[in-house]
């Protein structure tokens, strides 16, 4: 994950990430006594929901600053900094849960293999992340605005089709029990700065490719390009498309 994370901005203006994750927790249905790994736990906003039925929840995230915030806000949970592609924790887990994380990691096959190693036979892998076409208007504008200013920028995100990701899971040893791709237009918090806040929170790689003294010009052009599609009723919206899945590890 190449983004530089700001825990305060994340919790203050992008809590919708965790709020939408509540229905994913219901789908995962952690049970009393189960061992659950929250893969990409961030600031820990879903830890209590995952443990509410009596499961023992461990968190893992690639950002030290996010994990520090989670440890301070949610004492009593085992939380670790680690790489989703190659983590090693005391196994096995009954459930690996992940929300809004996997699109940050293009090496999807490595993640799937790591998850499979961490699960017991019959263990569940339940997740949601950006799917094919996610934030297309925003991404296209970020790239176009950069090109117009003479900068060659690249998207850091992995937004696969259902077919592509189902294949990844199958090869890693999973039986896929659910795979959905759906639109979720999401209202951003601030009616004026909502899109800029989103780019500052999630689009750090784009901003890193533009000189800081030109950020304002760059972001203004991104807003200009997206306004006809993503600004309505006085608010900015992100054109999210989500890939939601459930899978079970096949017995060895």
Locations of the language-model features?
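Class I SAM-dependent methyltransferase SAM/SAH-binding core
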Residues: 37-39, 43-87
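C-terminal helical/coil "lid" or tail adjacent to the Rossmann-like core of SAM-dependent
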Residues: 177-233
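A short glycine-rich, Lys/Arg-flanked "PGG" loop and its adjoining helix->strand segment in the class I
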Residues: 109-124
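Conserved class I S-adenosyl-L-methionine
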Residues: 1-34, 45-49, 66-69, 126-148
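A short acidic, Gly/Pro-enriched loop at the edge of an enzyme's catalytic core
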Residues: 85-96
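Short alpha-helix
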Residues: 158-172
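A short SAM/SAH-binding and catalytic strip from SAM-dependent methyltransferases
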Residues: 95-108
């Amino acid at each position: 994950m190449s983004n530089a994370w700001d825990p305060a901005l994340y919790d203050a203006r992008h809590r919708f990430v965790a709020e939408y994750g509540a229905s994913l927790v219901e789908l995962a249905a952690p049970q009393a006594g189960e061992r659950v790994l929250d893969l990409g736990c961030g600031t820990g906003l879903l830890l209590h929901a995952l443990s509410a039925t009596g499961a023992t929840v461990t968190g893992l995230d690639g950002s030290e600053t996010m994990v520090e915030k989670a440890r301070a806000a949610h004492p009593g949970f085992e939380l670790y900094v680690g790489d989703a592609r190659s983590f090693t924790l005391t196994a096995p887990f009954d459930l690996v849960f992940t929300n809004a994380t996997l699109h940050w990691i293009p090496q999807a096959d490595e993640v799937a293999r790591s998850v499979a190693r961490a699960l017991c036979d019959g263990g569940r892998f339940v997740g949601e992340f950006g799917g094919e076409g996610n934030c297309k208007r925003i991404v296209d504008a970020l790239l176009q605005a950069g090109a117009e200013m003479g900068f060659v920028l690249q998207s850091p995100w992995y937004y696969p089709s259902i077919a592509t990701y189902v294949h990844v899971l199958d090869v890693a040893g999973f039986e896929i029990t659910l795979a959905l791709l759906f639109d979720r237009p999401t209202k951003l918090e601030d009616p004026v700065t909502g899109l800029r806040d989103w780019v500052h929170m999630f689009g750090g790689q784009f901003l890193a490719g533009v000189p800081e003294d030109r950020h304002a010009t760059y972001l203004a052009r991104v807003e200009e390009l997206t306004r006809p599609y993503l600004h309505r009723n006085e608010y900015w919206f992100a054109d999210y498309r989500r890939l939601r899945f459930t899978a079970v590890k096949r017995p060895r």
